[in-house]
Amino acid sequence: MTRIALCYSGRPRSILECYKNHQDNFGLGNDNVDVFAHLWFNEILTGTNFRQDVGQGTWPNDEIKKWIDENWKPKKIVYENPKSFDHMFTENWNPQWHQAHPKDNQISMFYGIEKVINLKKQHENEHNFKYDYVVRMRTDLNFIEHPGNLEQYDKTKLHVFNVIPGQDWIQTGIKDFAILDIIAWGGSDIMDKYSTTYFNLEKIVKENCPTFTPDAILGYNAIKVNNLNVQKHPWTFKIYVGSTTYSN
């Protein structure tokens, strides 16, 4: 039986709305599929917007934790108060493009990815096994077309969406290594390496990787630092409350 780990990280966005989609596309709730999560949460934020610059919904109340326990049935989960990372890399953070994702949001994501994959690794070590496939994704991911069974994917590769590069990727030179930050999967060892972006961030920044997008930093860590074999796919999906459909 193929064993799969779904690893959620980030803010608890659109969890109820995307539940069935994740059941249909990733087997959420099946006996061979386990859930791990590192989620930012502070009940004081209930009802406020996740972000002020783009519409991503509002922070849920504490009842979401009970819902997650009853429906996701996570093997391990950590809720952490949102942290600020603005104090990091104040002198050598180099976007290299006129529009940039907030540094704090980017580093927060790298931190969460590392934390949730570490939870998965702890469970593997405690039970002396490795998952066949590990999926790292946002809670508000909504697939429009089924990506196919995970067993069809080579577990020795990192699987990501095939982004058509825009001028920002082309002119900054990141088109050769950048990978979309919304979702990725592969074998357990592959995803362990994928998750080391936060650990390797000082090295990545010192080597002058453009920092205007987390796609560049994640890809730099995967390809330049960890030498992962990356395979890109023409999946079709969107962020639940977003207007953009990702497709080729």
Question: Where are the regions a protein language model picked out?
Answer:
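Short acidic, S/G/P-rich loop/turn micro-motifs used as interaction or catalytic elements
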Residues: 11-16, 43-44, 142-144, 190
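Short alpha-helix within the catalytic core of nucleotide-sugar-dependent glycosyltransferases
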Residues: 19-20, 121, 144-154
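A short beta-strand-loop structural module common to alpha/beta enzyme folds
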Residues: 32-43, 233
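Catalytic core and acceptor-binding pocket of nucleotide-sugar-dependent glycosyltransferases
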Residues: 103-119, 123-129, 142-146, 167-174, ...
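Short aromatic/hydrophobic "clamp" motif used to bind/position activated sugar donors
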Residues: 134, 140
